[in-house]
From Swiss-Prot:
PANTHER family attached to this UniProt entry: ENDORIBONUCLEASE YBEY, CHLOROPLASTIC
GO MF terms held by the record: metalloendopeptidase activity; RNA endonuclease activity; zinc ion binding
Example of a GO biological process term: rRNA processing
InterPro entries cross-referenced by the UniProt entry: MetalPrtase_cat_dom_sf_prd, YbeY, YbeY_CS
UniProt KW Calcium keyword: no
Cofactor binding mode and count: Binds 1 zinc ion.
Name of the molecule in the record: Endoribonuclease YbeY
Organism: Levilactobacillus brevis (strain ATCC 367 / BCRC 12310 / CIP 105137 / JCM 1170 / LMG 11437 / NCIMB 947 / NCTC 947) (Lactobacillus brevis)
PROSITE patterns given in the database record: UPF0054
Gene: ybeY
Function: Single strand-specific metallo-endoribonuclease involved in late-stage 70S ribosome quality control and in maturation of the 3' terminus of the 16S rRNA.
Protein EC: 3.1.-.-
Length: 162
C-alpha cells in the first residue's frame, strides 16, 4: 500500500510513532487483502486544526480524535462515462481510498483517560479511520459489532493489545 503521512503538528511527531502508523496500516491493508497499489494518506495534527476540519466538513463544533474522508466509487456522474480498459492496465492504476486526519493531542488525552499506552491508542485510531475508508461504519448496532470486532482483531494480531 502506498501510504503518505503528513505531520502538521507544531512539535513534530517522533519517528517511532510515524513508523508505527506506517506499519500498522500496512498490516491492516494485508489483513483486509487490499491491492498492493492501494493509496491513502494520514495527516497528523493538533486539536485546533482537527476542530476546524470537524466544524467545516461535519458541522460539529469541537475537536475529535479521528476523521476519515473516503473516496467513493459510486459517483453517478462518473458512471455515465465508464472507462473501459483491459484487466492488466486496470490492475496497474492505483486506487486511492481516501484520507485520515488524527489529532495527536487526542491520542495522548485518550490513552491517559483509558489507561493504555499511547501506541495502542494511536494504532486504534488509525485502524478505526482505515476501516471507515474501507466501507465499515458503526451507525447501526450490528455494523458496530462487525467493525469493532475487526478493529480489535487487527490490533490484537498486530500486537497492540489493551
Amino acid at each position: 500500500m502506498d501510504l503518505e503521512i503528513y505531520d502538521k503538528t507544531q512539535d513534530g511527531v517522533p519517528a517511532e510513532h510515524v513508523n508505527l502508523i506506517q506499519d500498522v496500516l500496512q498490516y491492516a491493508g494485508k489483513y483486509l487483502k487490499l491491492a498492493d497499489n492501494t493509496e491513502m494518506s494520514v495527516t497528523l495534527m493538533n486539536n485546533e486544526d482537527i476542530h476546524r476540519i470537524n466544524q467545516q466538513y461535519r458541522g460539529v463544533d469541537r475537536a475529535t480524535d479521528v476523521i476519515s474522508f473516503a473516496i467513493e466509487d459510486d459517483d453517478e456522474e462518473a458512471a455515465d462515462f465508464p472507462l473501459v480498459m483491459d484487466d492488466e492496465l486496470a490492475a496497474e492504476i492505483p486506487e486511492n481510498i481516501g484520507d485520515i486526519f488524527v489529532s495527536m493531542d487526542k491520542v495522548a488525552e485518550q490513552a491517559d483517560y483509558l489507561g493504555h499506552s499511547y501506541e495502542r491508542e494511536l494504532g486504534f485510531l488509525v485502524v478505526h479511520g482505515f476501516l471507515h475508508l474501507n466501507g465499515y461504519d458503526h451507525m447501526e448496532p450490528e455494523d458496530e459489532k462487525v467493525m469493532f470486532k475487526l478493529q480489535a482483531d487487527i490490533l490484537d494480531a498486530y500486537g497492540l493489545k489493551r
